[in-house]
Structures are given as C-alpha cells and as structure tokens.
UniProtKB/Swiss-Prot annotation:
Organism this protein belongs to: Gallus gallus (Chicken)
Gene name in the database record: PSMB5
EC top class, as a word: hydrolase
Pfam family, one: Proteasome
Chief localization: cytoplasm
A GO term, aspect molecular function: threonine-type endopeptidase activity
Removed propeptide positions: 1-55
Protein's UniProt name: Proteasome subunit beta type-5
Length: 256
C-alpha cells in the first residue's frame, strides 16, 4: 500500500514551471491536458478525455438592403437536449451582431469580450468600429489560444460606412468575408434552401422569409437543431429583431 501511494504521489504535475502571470506561456503537457475538448475537425486526443457534441444551425447572408441573420435555439449535451431557449445571437453594439455555434461558453465569452473592445475603440476613435475591424479583432484574440480546446464558429454581421458586412470567424483564427454563411450541424440543410432562393435584389420581407424557412428545414432534418427560429435584420440604422417563432408552429406554413 505504501508503495502504491508513493507511485501516486510521484505522478508528473500538469506543469513543472511555477505559477505564471496572466498571458505568459504555460506548459500544459501533463495529464490534465487529456481533458481538453478537441477542436472542430481535429483528431481525438490520446487517452481518456471529454467527448462533447455541439449541434446548432445559424445562418446569415447579405442582400441589397442589409444583412439577414437567423438562428435556432436548441442546445445539446451529447445526445440529450439541454435547452430549447438559448439566445444564439450576441448583440455586440447597435450595428453589430455575432452568432453562436460550437461551445456556448466559448462563443458567449469571446463575443462579449469583443463587445467591450468595440466600445473601447469607439471611445478612443470617436466613431463606431467597422465590421471588418471587429471581425479581425476577434480572430486575433482567439488565434492566441489555437489548439487549446476552444470550440467556436461565429459570424460577425453588421452595417458600417461601407455598407453591409459579413465575416466568418472560428476558434482556429480563420476569418473569411462572404455573401452567405451557414454554420452548425444543420448547415448543409440550410445551404440547400439558401442556394435555391437567395438573390442580391431580394426585398426585405422576402429575405426574412427565406432565412426563416432555411432554419426551419434544418431544424426539421437535424436532430441537434430546433426550438425556435429567431430572425434579425441589420440595416443602415442598425439591427432589429424581427421575429421569433416556434419550429412546431411553422410546420404547417412551410408544408412540412
């Protein structure tokens, strides 16, 4: 028994280095690193670890009158539904929105931190931050933690002096401008609807209806998406929350 206890005591610590100040590089190569959540698309870590499944459907696209953003509201923990009422749009400032896909805590923390940094920028420069600058700021912040288990796929949507803006940013530091994105486990179903109905010259009501229908079809086919469909419109005067409908209530209207 004594030898067994000694063997346990001699287990290598998570870090041989003394406590480091915030922001300093740390060696996390010890056993606790086995509990890290693997990044999207990454290989499983060797040995026992946490296996977390993330499911959602979020989308955004640009058109002549701004940007339309639509999300579902279901959160899952593995194969179980954890919540049907998650708010997956982060209201960064009156002209900027961010979406959540991946780990809810990661998305919420980094986008709220982005909101604070955007406010600091506005106070220093006496003008609102552009969509491009806000997305670059987020990408730079999360890139410092690449490979450390963050799980985030977000869209930064807004309107600035250049017009509508839309960027995809993920936890690997990827930053891509685009006309339309769908992110999450139901994204392939949403893309099918968007690609068949999206046009640059759409009327606002038509664009809102298309986004709502795309999320509904994704929620219908993807077990990890559901709850309610919430739609936002971002225009020259900022964003507005247009509607929130329960998925079950939309079933008859879209010929389910």
């Amino acid at each position: 028994c004594n030898m067994a206890l000694a063997d346990i005591v001699r287990l290598p610590p998570a870090s041989e280095a003394p406590f480091a100040p915030l922001g300093a590089p740390r060696d996390l190569s010890g056993p606790p690193s086995k509990l890290a959540v693997r990044p999207w698309g990454g290989a499983d870590l060797p040995g026992p670890g946490l296996q977390l499944l993330h499911g959602t459907t979020t989308l955004a696209f640009k058109f002549a009158h701004g940007v339309v953003v639509a999300v579902d509201s279901r959160a899952t923990a593995g194969s179980y539904i954890a919540s049907q009422t998650v708010q997956k749009v982060i209201e960064i400032n009156p002209s900027l929105l961010g979406t959540m896909a991946g780990g809810a805590a990661d998305c919420s923390f980094w986008e709220r931190l982005l909101a604070r940094q955007c406010r600091v920028y506005e106070l220093r420069n006496k003008e609102p931050i552009s969509v491009a600058a806000a997305s670059k700021l987020l990408a730079n912040m999360v890139y410092q933690y690449k490979g450390m288990g963050l799980s985030m796929g977000t869209m930064i949507c807004g309107w600035d002096k250049r017009g509508p803006g839309l960027y995809y940013v993920d936890s690997e530091g990827t930053r891509i401008p685009g006309e339309a994105f769908a992110v999450g486990s139901g994204s392939s179903y949403a893309y099918g609807v968007l690609d068949g109905g999206r046009r640059p010259d759409m009327a606002t009501d038509e664009a809102l209806e298309l986004a709502r229908r795309a999320i509904f079809q994704a929620a219908r086919r993807d077990a990890y998406s559901g709850g309610s469909v919430t739609v936002y419109h971002v225009g020259p005067r900022g964003w507005r929350r247009v509607s929130s409908h329960d998925v079950a209530g939309l079933h008859d209207g879209y010929g389910g």
